[in-house]
Amino acid sequence: MRYLRMLSNSVIAAGVASGYLTVLVLQLNPSISIDPATLLPLALVFGVAYGANLTVAFYALIVMRQILAVEVLSPGWLSVRLLSWLCTIAAGAASALMWLNFRGFGDVLDPITRDRMFVGAALVTASAVIFLGLGLAHLGRRGGRISAAILSTTMVLSVAAPIVARGPARQPPLPMPPTATVIDGGTSASDSHIRMLMFDGASLEVILSSVAAGRLPNIARIIDKGSVLHLATLRPTQAEPVWSSIATGRYPMSNGVRSAVVYRVLDGTPIQLLPDYCFTQALVTFGFLSEQQQTAADLLARPIWNILSDRGASVGVIGW
């Protein structure tokens, strides 16, 4: 029975950790509604995909502790001593993930989403501190009913509170519909031309090294007679959201293309953005999530060439 009780604590801690990952997906995708029809499939996928692996990892930690410790631990089905430390690990790792994703995606999130994600990450960080305090308070002694109540309440609130802070489903701010513009007949008459050459994946380091080797003489003349500078990119660093932002002049949340594909859980609610640093692409590889390619219909903002055409400029687009 001892090993079954060790397993039960591992399953509980893994469930809490899977809940944190579900919260992170909800934070990055404010358009996902919070209702049982949406949350249950999402929690089920993360519980199966991550919960099973985390259960094995937590169980291995407990076994290692049993081997190395002087006193063999005989935990209860819900052990305050065990779960306080396992939840410290889970909440600490989850808070680090949330802060890393907040830093990585913060520039492409709208202010409301960014602020709510900040609050959620702070709440999980505070939960990790509480779990750590419980663990330190019960070194070498069993927990009582009060400790178990505090632990259970913190586990529930550490998942529920960030969801409440995230708020109900909210559509990101979209661009205003175009208004009719009266074009002067002489506006489009001009002898000047603008040509934009855009190469996918051609970083400035690659171009400059090729120019130095004499392989790009035409681009070398452009560099010699023009200006050259580095540009920061967006996250995720995928062609579709980056080029959509270039074409529309709007961030991904406003132009409708936030990643290369749209992900679906059990062919249900679409997920536009997956978090980084937690192997979420493996969910697609192993069939937990399905992919749907982005199309031109997903672009909610107007590209610059359409805007210029409305104002009388002659525009030609090749290879878009």
What is the predicted role of each segment?
Residues 219, 246-320:
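Long, well-ordered early-domain segments
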Residues 20-24, 54-63, 126-139, 160-164:
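Alpha-helical transmembrane segments
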Residues 99-106, 164-172:
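Transmembrane alpha-helix boundary signature
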Residues 1-117:
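Extended, compositionally biased non-globular segments that define protein topology
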Residues 167-230, 237:
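Active-site-proximal N-terminal segment of extracellular/periplasmic enzymes that hydrolyze or transfer
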Residues 143-166:
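Internal/C-terminal transmembrane anchor helices
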Residues 41-44, 205-261, 314-318:
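Short, structured active-site-proximal loop/turn typified by the sulfatase FGly-forming signature C/S-X-P-X-R
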Residues 9-13, 121-126, 148-154:
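Hydrophobic H-region at the start of alpha-helical membrane spans
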